[in-house]
């Protein structure tokens, strides 16, 4: 949520990288890398469905109030942690290279006038790549609010209340 708002309020392009491993069955996994560019006209991470506001709230609570987080976890109000978090150097390095390529495209224009792609997803297990051109959602509180574009410094910082 922070990166979305930071890019929007300050008009600074942000490149977000994610790596996810999803359990297919007891012995195999699907492995994905995602690179999203947060610039005007591209869908934000919320619009693209790449972040879950509930999980973001839980992660904030875990950092800021571990006791309250633990209580919610004990009451089964915290989302599960069923999929592993990958840290395989070849895959993380490739995901980082995808992000650097988008940055180079953004500053040099070598890929043409369309600029950076909104979202690229590499499916390592299938050995392919997909480009998602998701439009911003009309009711998005982050990327479709005209009052936040280039707003800069405000109190509270980027209108975030914890």
Where are these regions (language model features)?
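Short, acidic Gly/Pro/Ser/Thr-rich loop/turn segments
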Residues: 22, 52-54, 148-150
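Phosphate-binding loop/pocket of nucleotide- and phosphate-handling active sites
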Residues: 105-162
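Glycine-rich beta-alpha junction loops
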Residues: 19-23, 51, 124-126
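Active-site proximal loops enriched in glycine and acidic residues that flank catalytic Cys/His/Asp
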Residues: 18-19, 48, 92, 144
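Adenosine-phosphate binding glycine-rich loop
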Residues: 26-118
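Generic recognition of flexible, low-complexity loop/linker segments
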Residues: 2-3, 87, 127-129
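Rossmann-fold NAD(P)-binding glycine/threonine-rich loop
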Residues: 1-41
């Amino acid at each position: 949520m922070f990166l979305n708002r930071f890019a929007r309020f300050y008009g600074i392009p942000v490149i977000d990288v994610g790596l996810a491993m999803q359990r297919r069955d007891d012995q195999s996994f699907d492995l994905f890398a995602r690179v999203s560019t947060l610039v005007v006209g591209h869908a934000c991470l919320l619009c693209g469905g790449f972040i879950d506001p509930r999980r973001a709230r839980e992660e904030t609570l875990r950092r800021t109030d571990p006791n309250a987080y633990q209580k919610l976890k004990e009451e089964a109000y915290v989302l599960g942690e069923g999929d592993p978090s990958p840290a395989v150097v070849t895959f993380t390095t490739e995901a980082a290279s995808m992000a650097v390529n988008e940055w180079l495209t953004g500053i040099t224009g070598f890929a043409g006038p369309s600029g950076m792609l909104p979202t690229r997803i590499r499916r390592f297990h299938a050995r392919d790549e997909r480009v998602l051109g998701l439009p911003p959602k009309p009711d998005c509180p982050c990327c479709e609010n005209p009052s936040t574009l280039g707003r800069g410094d405000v109190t509270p910082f980027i209108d975030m209340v914890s």
